């Protein structure tokens, strides 16, 4: 069975987790912001709908 040679230090582990959590928080904030702008109608984002895709074919 594969086993790591040495234990990863707590500080290295915490740094990695902090990086992952920060990236996840940034993406969540972007998604929330986009959702809010779509709901308020202030966005220039065009959400693709199935009807538009059928017309192109």
Curated annotation (Swiss-Prot):
Name of one Pfam family that matches: Ribosomal_L32p
A single GO BP: translation
Superkingdom assignment: Bacteria
Keywords tagged on the record: Ribonucleoprotein, Ribosomal protein
Record's GO cellular component terms: large ribosomal subunit
One example GO MF annotation: structural constituent of ribosome
Ranges where the record places region Disordered: 1-23
Family listed: Belongs to the bacterial ribosomal protein bL32 family.
NCBIfam families cross-referenced by the UniProt entry: rpmF_bact
Name the record gives this protein: Large ribosomal subunit protein bL32
Gene: rpmF
